[in-house]
């Protein structure tokens, strides 16, 4: 299933590096840092990185999620400050990525470096019905770890 997403290039330096799917099977599109100069993230520090791009999904049946790039997280301890970014279908502002250095070493974010990936996902908006009791289930109120270890 494909949808058309409107995209604005807010900084012309990003015009040649707009997000594209790297392969036919790619789920995510890489987002890049729209920076004038390198930014050093100290251990434990967060920084809100502009991308120079805005998108408009328009259709409430879709949203976009921003996720860490696996290599940055595994090799350098760089993840998203909010763990997952959610872009609602009606948002039209600049995409920004909160980077968090959870490592013990400084990390340098370079201009135009790939910093996160964006995945467009289908959304279901639930309607809620208030009840006094739930119909029983085998799990009941069992929470964390209640289904056993595998």
Curated annotation (Swiss-Prot):
InterPro entries: dUTPase, dUTPase-like, dUTPase-like_sf, dUTPase_trimeric. It catalyses: dUTP + H2O = dUMP + diphosphate + H(+). Its cofactor is Mg(2+). Its EC number is 3.6.1.23. One of its GO terms (molecular function) is magnesium ion binding. Pathway: Pyrimidine metabolism; dUMP biosynthesis; dUMP from dCTP (dUTP route): step 2/2. Coiled coil: none annotated. GO terms for biological process: dUMP biosynthetic process; dUTP catabolic process. Substrate binds at residues 69-71, 82, 86-88, 96. The keyword ATP-binding does not apply. Keywords: Hydrolase, Magnesium, Metal-binding, Nucleotide metabolism. HAMAP family: dUTPase_bact. PANTHER family: DEOXYURIDINE 5'-TRIPHOSPHATE NUCLEOTIDOHYDROLASE. Belongs to the dUTPase family. This enzyme is involved in nucleotide metabolism: it produces dUMP, the immediate precursor of thymidine nucleotides and it decreases the intracellular concentration of dUTP so that uracil cannot be incorporated into DNA. This is Deoxyuridine 5'-triphosphate nucleotidohydrolase.
